[in-house]
Design a protein with these regions (language model features):
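N-terminal amphipathic/hydrophobic interface segments
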Residues: 37-109, 233, 239-240, 245, ...
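Outer-membrane beta-barrel and related beta-rich outer-membrane complex signature
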Residues: 152-154, 316-320, 478-486
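Extracellular loop and loop/strand-boundary signature of outer-membrane beta-barrel proteins
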Residues: 110-111, 274-278, 440-443
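Elongated, acidic membrane-bridging lipid-handling scaffolds
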Residues: 41, 162-269, 274, 332-433, ...
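Extended terminal
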Residues: 2-49, 251-253, 298-299, 338-348, ...
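Transmembrane beta-barrel strands of outer-membrane/channel proteins
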Residues: 142, 260-262, 306-308, 424-426, ...
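Flexible beta-edge/linker motif
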Residues: 89-155, 169-194, 220-222, 227, ...
């Protein structure tokens, strides 16, 4: 039988190649690798294209950012009244559609220096979590903003007849970003107010704020829908926190209902402001907590506690302040007549601990000061017009730093004028400590003696009932060592006054006693209750402590 040769396998057959061995399926279908030189050239080309593209984007972005900055600056200033804004830079990110503004400065046109606000960075972006709820809104984040206002700027703001809601602030903020803002945050901001003394500013540092749901996209109508929280450091050592809800869309102005808490707030920085009410403040630490509501339809404050520690407070009366005192009294009378005060306030408890409270009269020929030191005062259930029921006050301390002082009072709703009961007792006060008062009203000096006074005062239905009874013990108004440099005539007056005190003495106890009747009718039922208290007590006190001294000195002068 004839044998035939097997045909040689071709390279396309799935058999072993005589040169390369068995051939794998699809081996010739793989792309051949480029030479190393060609691969380097392609990589370099891609890098060059990417760099060129980035350069083009950077150039376009830079020009667009400048165009955006100028456009936004113009739009903002077109909406503001009395203020102007400059922007240091602006950038719009194409990836998340966020807008960043840098180095924003706000100036008051009437008083441009210093700027009223500086904003290093403001970021506006889409609020993505609300987008999942099919609400297209935005958020704004202010990083390290600072607000700086001085007295001239504040006075200019108060003079402006344009309402705050019409000055364009909300429109200016909305001009920044095409979407409505629903979340606003402030991070590590600062607020500074400078009154007359730039060395004692009113300042809040480390200020943080968060306001959510501003557009009310989640809550029912008729409620305060926007959670709000703000906190900061007050005057370097104090701390304040406010937390509650707001309605930013209410008209004509936003409403708020919130709780607040103040801790260890130093009060001395308020001295420049308190001086406008004739009050001088030194020291003092404030703690307080409560809640308030302030809106177009309802306004009310409920303060649970106000506690002030180690305060020195003086009420100053001078010829220059007399007009202001009359004006404040008239304003208080108008408020008392108004059945709907601007904001009713109720204070559950007010406490003044270990403090000094005084009255300084610089309008007298011989200025004098009366004070109670180591004062502890507690007032409970204090409300506007005492409409929340009777308020009760209790006071203890040392009169003129020596005698013990006690006082209590009950204040009732004043529908027909001031309505209250008051009792005061001062025992064992040093008479020499009151020489400034004695010189002012009696033109005399006391070198020895103690003073006590007891008083009860009641006002109801415009009828005043009460008395002031002083007891002056071991009084001596003449001393040769003290009188060496005094005019002879003045020495004679003091000898006469000294003789008078001995005539009035109760011999067994070596005391001078008299009683001043306070019965009568209240002339002005619209007077402030505090004005009535101060006037009655001070007038009766002066008459009681100088029983007949004025008369005898005047008689001696005529002789």
């Amino acid at each position: 039988m004839k044998l035939h040769k097997r045909p040689a396998f071709s390279r396309d057959a799935d058999h072993e190649s005589p040169r390369t061995g068995p051939r794998r399926i699809g081996e010739d279908d793989k792309p051949q690798k480029a030479p190393p030189e060609q691969r380097v050239s392609r990589s370099l080309l891609w890098w060059i294209l990417a760099a060129a593209l980035l350069l083009i984007v950077a150039i376009v972005s830079r020009h667009f950012d400048e165009f955006l900055r100028r456009t936004l600056e113009t739009k903002i200033n077109q909406r503001l009244h009395g203020y102007s804004v400059t922007l240091g830079g602006a950038h719009l990110s194409p990836f998340n559609f966020s807008l960043t503004l840098r180095d924003g400065v706000i100036r008051q046109q009437a008083h441009p220096d210093p700027p009223v606000a500086a904003i290093p960075r403001l970021t506006a972006s889409v609020e993505w979590k609300e987008l999942l709820r099919f609400h297209l809104v935005a958020n704004a984040v202010f990083d390290r903003p600072s607000v700086h206002v001085n007295l001239p700027q504040l006075q200019e703001e108060n003079k402006d007849e344009v309402d705050v809601e019409d000055r364009g602030w909300q429109d200016a903020l909305q001009a920044i970003y095409p979407l409505k803002f629903n979340l606003i945050q402030v991070r590590e901001g600062a607020i500074v107010y400078v009154d007359k003394d730039p060395k004692r500013p009113f300042e809040i540092t480390h200020w943080n704020l968060s306001a959510e749901n501003i557009r009310n996209v989640r809550s029912a109508q008729g409620v305060y829908p926007s959670p709000v929280r703000t906190e900061g450091v007050l005057f370097g050592t104090g701390r304040g926190v406010l937390e509650g809800h707001m309605d930013f869309l209410s008209k004509p102005y936003p409403g708020i209902h919130a709780l607040y808490k103040l801790e260890k707030v130093p009060l001395e920085r308020l001295g420049m402001i308190s001086s406008r009410a004739n009050l001088e403040i030194e020291g003092g630490i404030l703690d307080s907590n409560g809640e308030f509501e302030y809106g177009p339809k309802h306004r009310e404050a409920h303060i649970e506690d106000v506690t002030i520690h180690k305060l020195r407070l003086d009420y100053i009366h001078t010829a220059a302040t007399a007009g202001a005192e009359k004006e404040r009294a008239a304003q208080a009378a108008e408020v008392a007549q108004d059945d709907t005060p601007p904001m009713p306030v109720k204070i559950d408890r007010f406490r003044l601990n270990d403090s000094l409270v005084g009255v300084v009269n610089r309008n007298a020929d011989d200025p004098y000061r009366l004070f109670v030191s180591n004062a502890d005062l507690t007032v409970t259930n204090l409300s506007s017009g005492f409409k929340g029921g009777p308020a009760v006050a209790k006071l203890t301390g040392k009169f003129m730093g020596s005698g013990t002082a006690r006082g209590s009072a009950t204040f009732r709703e004043d529908n027909n004028g001031p309505d209250f009961d008051m009792a005061i007792a001062i025992e064992g006060a040093s008479l020499p400590s009151m020489n400034d008062l004695l010189r002012s009203y009696g033109k005399l000096d006391v070198v020895k003696g103690t003073f006590s006074v007891y008083s009860e005062i009641s006002i109801q239905n415009r009828q005043i009932k009460g008395y002031v009874k002083p007891l002056i013990k071991d009084v001596d108004v003449y001393d040769s060592k003290q009188d060496k440099k005094k005019p002879v005539l003045k020495k004679i007056y003091e000898k006469i006054a000294g003789g008078l005190s001995h005539i009035l003495e109760n011999q067994p106890r070596d005391e001078v006693a008299t009683v001043v009747d306070l019965s009568g009718t209240l002339d002005d039922p619209n007077s402030s209750i505090w004005e009535v208290v101060v006037r009655l007590v001070s007038n009766a006190f002066v008459k009681a402590i100088l029983p007949g001294f004025d008369h005898e000195v005047e008689k001696a002068q005529k002789d």
